[in-house]
Amino acid sequence: MRSLTIRRPDDWHLHLRDGAMLEGVIGDTSRHFARAIIMPNLVPPVVTTADAEAYRQRILAAVPKGDRFEPLMTLYLTEQTSPDDVEEGKTTGLITAVKLYPAGATTNSHGGVRDLDKAMPVLERMAKIGLPLCVHGEVTTPEVDIFDREAVFIDTVLDPLRRRLPELKVTMEHVTTSDGIDYILSADSNLAGSITTHHLIINRNAILVGGIRPHYYCLPVAKRESHRLALRRAATSGDSRFFLGTDSAPHVDPLKECGCGCAGIYTSINTMSCLAHVFEEDEALERLEAFVSLNGPAWYGLQPNDEMITLVRRDAPVAFPAKIETGAGPVTVFDPMFPIHWDVEAAIQA
């Protein structure tokens, strides 16, 4: 196959940051993606509908002229979150989901939930009104090995929560393990998972073999090869419970290349090209559209995009920049460590 035309994709997990960084990265998403669920872990975090509306306006103001892009806003769940404010956000259409960060699990998560019981009034209201909970599925207790955090979270936090509140709709974000895939597949309803571009491509060797390579460090951290292959099978299967959430997370290089570097990989600029390679390699190009354009909207109760994009397979590898320059500083672009031949040629208006 030399070309593939699909509905314009969406990104169901995206970090845009704010200020100069937002202005520097938004175009890499809006060029290809029609919508994205925007993560709320700013400093300070997006905890109220007023915060979300203000952030939404900043995002829209930064979208390059001519691009059509809709940010889908989320709230950062705290133990003080107001159920009424959450319901108002859902009613007005401002809020697409609420995000659960276990305290300390990832970048700017120190204000997250420590005692889930204190957040139950909000979760119960969300279940009642049909608002999804997006979860960063890792425990942060120091006695748990970092490579086991997801599996332990499922057993000790997520499964008990879903048994307690089975009507709550839950998105397991950036699934990284076969445990997570199997748990989603075992569920009857109200559970789905997003999968990142980079977790389909790298395993933990990318971070550790031949020296520490900080630009492959993210949270949840990449796991062993058997888990990567489980993610590949899920993503390329066409199963409607799995969809793209890039977790593209820009950090300026000095914050990555240091003694205690930040977690995050920047993939927005080359995600569609990388995914076309992955799906072609797994003989599943005909299911790429489901993963990037159809399954996510269906899960979140939205219509697929009317616009289309065309991917073309070039004879020569497509060149992507090693870094992008932003007003905040340089950001290294994800290197998949293979030649990329697929290119997004055109976005077609409906």
Swiss-Prot record:
EC number annotated for this UniProt entry: 3.5.2.3
Chain coiled-coil ranges: none
Cellular component terms per the entry's GO annotation: cytosol
Cofactor binding annotation: Binds 2 Zn(2+) ions per subunit.
Binding site for Zn(2+) 2: 99, 136, 174
Residues the entry annotates as binding substrate: 15-17, 41, 136, 219, 251, 263
InterPro entries with a match to the protein in the record: Amidohydro-rel (IPR006680), DHOdimr (IPR004721), Dihydroorotase_CS (IPR002195), Metal_Hydrolase (IPR032466)
Reaction(s) catalysed (UniProt annotation): (S)-dihydroorotate + H2O = N-carbamoyl-L-aspartate + H(+)
Residue numbers annotated as active site: 247
Family: Belongs to the metallo-dependent hydrolases superfamily. DHOase family. Class II DHOase subfamily.
Subunit details: Homodimer.
Protein name: Dihydroorotase
The organism of origin for this protein: Allorhizobium ampelinum (strain ATCC BAA-846 / DSM 112012 / S4)
Gene from which the chain derives: pyrC
